[in-house]
Amino acid sequence: YESDQFMGNVYVDIELLRNLKFHSDFTLASYNYDNSYFSPSYLQEIWVGSPYYAQLTTNNSKYASTSINFRLDYNYHTGKHLFGAMAGYGADRSRSTGGTNMYQGFPNDDNLDNVGSAQSVLMYSDYVAKSGLNSVYGRLSYDYDSRYLLEVSMRADASSKFGPGNQWGVFPAVSTGWVINREAFMEKASWIDNLKMRLSWGQTGSTNVSDFSFRQFYTSSQYGESSSVKLQDLLPNRGIHWEKTNEVNFGLDFSFFGDRLYGSLDAYYRYTDGALAPAPHILESGMSNYYDNIIDMSNRGVEVSLGGYPVRGKDFAWNTDLNISVNRNRIESLNNAQINSYMQDAFIVGKPAGTVKGYIVDHIVQNMDEVNELNAKAVEKGFAEYQSGIGVGDFLMKDTDGNGTITSDDRQVIATPEPKFFGGWTNTFTYKNLSLSFLMQFSCGGEAVYSNLGEEISGVLGQSVGRELYGNTWTPERTDAKYARLVAGTMSYNYMANDRFVFDTSYLRMKNITLSYSLPKAWINKLYLSNASLFVTATNLFTITQWPGLDPETVATGITSMGTNNDPYPLSRSFSLGVKLQF
């Protein structure tokens, strides 16, 4: 495995005229990645149970992006009036290339990189992707006596992700501010350092879709000595366009008692019109993917930040900051579209995005008499059986629709990934040149399906039984167990998402803690430095949670799977020691 990364930035600022400035910057970023995996013949033999040739798989990718911006800023100040104007242009470009190759039939297990000695090429694939974004933007601002504030802005973006006629998106915004403590009637309130009210409205855009989804592409593949060219598995839609989000925000900033107490309050409402998602299409096309602007959703919430200095002395100070956020997401409309079966559970009108549907477990079957009775009733209603593949020790699901048999229509909402609230608490203690700071991160009230349980119960991937299941599955001697029996390689209803796999994802985490020491001024002056310090930092030190898996924060991030967790790679715990120098 090899990788290298580069990022560079240059900029220039020029004062063209009095009050008129020109700014330009250019950013270049690149990332190269090469990886190879060699499977010796003996390893393949152990895995598949029969002699096999050695294999070599190589992966490589290259990514490069550029960004260039030009901006003019003008400010004019007269008396109590301050006028400002800004106009700019930006262009972003990105290009990625890569490929995956698989070779087989090496003469021995020592040829780790000599692909020329392979007897055959099992797979060869490569790709090239390009994207671009052009932007023009402007802003006008007015400030009267640092008391009344007004700002109007507009930006227009053109994205290569959309086809002709839909590439441009225009996004206006307006904001106002009132610095209340500068009013004459507040002169006697000397304990108020700052009291500012804010109100804003604006539009933003998103290109939440893969590149060139409006255009049909071809893809080639090779298997052994044969190769083929076929249509890419994406039905193009020339009508897709920018997602647009309207947001209204009310805010209040405050600071009291010489900044001993400060904070802010924000209440917002966001409405996204035409969010992009997989949509229904003609099955005869043979394509499984098709995107359209079909989802309308809203977000409303409150964000509170409160901080201060409970202690601020000559040698010792304690600074603390607490922020709490509450957000409520809701799917408002699907615009008469029927989401495909893979996505429909994640987008339920009236529910948050990512909501999980699953079966409700009635109980665990203790004898076949009960099953036979249910099957007999199901046959009377014209069904083959009550629940397919069921046996003693299995989950018996509730027939929620009352039709006499278990189908996917019996699934109900079992988990909502949206937490009741979340936030962080930062504390910094300073004693002379020594400083200790830490951040506690928390989330309360979210739910997720621990999907590992279904895989472990059924043994479909050959994995071992985890801590949650161990000693807690049904056996003839353990009939009061929470979980169904262990049956290897069986895709029964025991495998399906159900309410017994749902757990609270609340947690309290020590996100980071840093101890630092600033060198005395006398030492710094001798070293011709402006500042110097030593520090040691630990991240993700510990987590307090009832989640049974590795990490409650690593639930899947995709909309369709954000309410599930099958133990992806957890956040790593790290320790670092460093020196910070300022010249």
Please place each PLM-identified region on the residue numbering.
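Surface-exposed extracellular loop regions of Gram-negative outer-membrane beta-barrel proteins
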Residues: 3-78, 82, 131-163, 167-182, ...
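Outer-membrane beta-barrel transmembrane domain signature of Gram-negative proteins
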Residues: 5, 40, 50-147, 201, ...
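Conserved small-residue
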Residues: 292, 309-416, 457, 539
